[in-house]
Amino acid sequence: MENRRFLRTEALLGHEGMERLRGARVMVVGLGAVGGYALEALARAGVGHLTLVDFDVFDESNINRQILALSSTVGRRKTEVARERVLDINPDCDVKIIETFVNADTLPQLLAEPVDYVVDAIDALNPKCCLMETLYRNGIPFISSMGAALKTDVSRIGLRRLSRTENCSLARFVRKRLKRRGVDIGKIVRSEEHTS
């Protein structure tokens, strides 16, 4: 029987586009709220090779906002839960997991194998800046999410140049730090919503 799993994606992108997705090597760094939803979309689109990076386990407090967090996953490693979910969606996907905290010492391990694109869903300043700078200097395409805490208006989420973000303290700190290091990042995902 023909695999009908990605027929709708192929109808949208064409056969060649679907083959590009099947051959794509994408890394998702950070498997919490933003990273979990990004991973879900990548898996359901038919991306063929995924590398999942996180150091944490699920806590009960994650359940209200993280797609991978369930009563049954509390206490389990985020990478393991994510791999199981991806393989449940697409059993043909090549899934690698790396259980580590991102820093200058662990980045060589993360980037030891070729990757076509990286999704940066890290929510801590130092690892985020370290990852972004390394990807930038190595010419590896990536998208980076900025702060989403306490933001609820999805109409205010979008792409914007890091140099032009407003109302996001994480983006402000990232911008300042990377500017000092001579790193000019293009577009990032951010929310322009004001929080009280």
Predicted region positions:
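Conserved small/polar residues in nucleotide/adenosyl-binding loops
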Residues: 193-195
